[in-house]
């Protein structure tokens, strides 16, 4: 009986060690235009193809990952994100840091018109990447506090390649609002793209919740799922 028990323990440990090599967390994300480090992170929002003749400004999917000090975000379009086509594109990441729809700025309406989103959020911040003719426009890339319209940061990492764009911004770059981001706290995220390729029609995504600093469950070759955080020793 003792031998069987020990063999069982060894099998479990073997499975755990196999999974550990594949575990992914936000600390492993490098902003380099190679998106393989996002593959194990689940999709937060899937968005339908609904922008006629504007695949480059039409969101397909969003992913979010956070560590204890950094917010990372991946945006995927149906076409080429930020293309060299001579048109202007503005991609926005919305952050509802207190996860309360009745605080911050709602995405239920925009410039007096309903957005038709089914799960609106009340955003305190957005992060914008603005592109014109494939070049970064002066002053168009920034993190903004929506209620005061205060620009908090223009110096954060981002990279585009093909259909995807990734960015990372440390919580400290939110200045006096940095304390709003706490490990274990649930936030909501969404996105919208506004550009001239489709007569300035806006593509709004639905929202998703995200726990700051959360560990992702990883499944590898039908082995036991495990949280990366559980593998770490204090």
Model segments located where?
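A short beta-turn/strand-edge loop motif at beta-sheet boundaries
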Residues: 80-87, 175-181
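Extracellular/luminal beta-rich ligand-recognition
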Residues: 25-26, 30-53, 83-162
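Short acidic, low-complexity intrinsically disordered linear motifs used
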Residues: 218-234
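Short, well-ordered beta-strand segments enriched in hydrophobic/aromatic residues
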Residues: 33, 69-79, 165-171
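Extended extracellular/luminal ectodomain segments enriched in beta-structured repeat modules
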Residues: 66-72, 86-88
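Bacterial N-terminal signal peptides that target proteins for export
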Residues: 1-9
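Bacterial N-terminal signal peptides
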Residues: 8-18
